[in-house]
């Protein structure tokens, strides 16, 4: 199999248990949801995982069955001097504006309003994102589009998007 990286730790456990019970090994390549979808459509793997659900026509065209396996959460991580784990609060609107490049510094009034007791530094914000075909990217960008109509119209939601800035990897 091949596909999403977020499910990989769970699949490792399942594969080990399956091998114990059956003596058969499961080979799974954590290459991203986009890669998994391409491989299942090309019939080069027996199963694939994607954080982005396939459309009905994709399922029918490729004679696939789709079902949920796990629930995955996406948590933005902030690393700032003097800020402790769990001390920073960001909401969807602020997060979307950070990724749109409209909020550029950590001491922006919108971030300060959510964190009135936190001493926010006058530092530039550097966003990081995935640049491969990622179901996590789809879910993250889909959320940003739901909380900010501008994100929805300018960027949209997909496994790969044209990020307005930041560092991809």
Residue ranges of predicted features:
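Flexible loop/hinge segments at secondary-structure junctions
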Residues: 2-169
